[in-house]
Amino acid sequence: MKSLQKGFTLIELMIVVAIIGILAAFAIPAYNDYIARTQVSEGVSLADGLKIRIADNLQDGDCTTKGDASTGEVGNEDKGKYALATIEGTPAANLSELKAEEKNGCLVKIEYGKGTSGGSVSALINNTELVLAQLANGSYVKESATVKDKFLPKALKETK
């Protein structure tokens, strides 16, 4: 009577381990890129929240507010978990004459690694920045960046 084989041979187990290792070699860098992209997106969301403040400030003739954040007034920055977004710039002299796609002079500087979580930001974007220029219609275009383009949202990659 023949005995039946029970379990796996050593070579079969080694092949499975090799396949898992190859898959992990591709999956881990892709996952790290995904994490960096989501953290960059948080900074862009912070910039979107500053649009209203910029519009209010422009009513007073400046991009930034003179308010004192320590007294409860809304300041020129917004801090998220991974990034700090700050309003900067000087409004264009002919603000009322600008076309919708022209820059109004106001900038939002997003600094990654300066959020509330501090060191938990991805190493791929830590200590980098993204500067967005606001258009007259309120939307943003990329002005400059030390963040790699592959981490930027698609809408920002297609501009400038």
Swiss-Prot record:
Q: What is its subcellular localisation?
A: Fimbrium; Membrane
**Cross-referenced Pfam families:** N_methyl, Pilin
Which cellular component terms (GO) are annotated to the entry? membrane; pilus
- Segments crossing the lipid bilayer: 8-28
* Superkingdom classification of source: Bacteria
Tell me yes or no: is tRNA-binding among this UniProt entry's keywords: no
Residues forming the propeptide are: 1-7
Sites of N-methylphenylalanine modification:
8
For this chain, the annotated S-S bridges are: 63-106
Q: Does the keyword Metal-binding apply?
A: no
Main location class:
other
Q: What keywords is this UniProt entry annotated with?
A: Disulfide bond, Fimbrium, Membrane, Methylation, Transmembrane, Transmembrane helix
Q: Which GO terms describe its biological process?
A: cell adhesion
Task: Give the similarity note.
Answer: Belongs to the N-Me-Phe pilin family.
Its job: Major component of the type IV fimbriae that plays an essential role in twitching motility, natural transformation, and protease secretion.
Subunit info?
Answer: The pili are polar flexible filaments of about 5.4 nanometers diameter and 2.5 micrometers average length; they consist of only a single polypeptide chain arranged in a helical configuration of five subunits per turn in the assembled pilus.
Mind telling me which NCBIfam families this protein's record contains?
IV_pilin_GFxxxE
Please report the name of this protein according to its UniProt entry. Type IV major fimbrial protein FimA
